[in-house]
């Protein structure tokens, strides 16, 4: 079983690999529920990582273009 920290790192890698990732794709990839996706996104934002969310059809999450660790 992966730790929450490991899943946060995996989420960051996923967001940096793709221009836009839906909450469902994140949940499926990390084997978590939608609420946990939102909590993890908030955790990354709290660490100063510029994760942006777009609602609605065609929406999803992304790291602001140009950001790299």
Positions of predicted regions on the chain:
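Short, basic/aromatic recognition patches that contact phosphate-bearing ligands
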Residues: 1-69
């Amino acid at each position: 079983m992966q730790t929450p920290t490991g899943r946060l790192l995996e989420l960051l890698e996923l967001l940096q690999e793709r221009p836009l990732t839906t909450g469902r794709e994140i949940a499926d990839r990390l084997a978590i529920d939608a609420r946990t996706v939102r909590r993890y996104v908030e955790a990354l934002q709290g660490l100063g990582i510029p994760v942006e969310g777009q609602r609605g059809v065609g929406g999803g999450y992304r790291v602001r273009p140009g950001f790299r660790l």
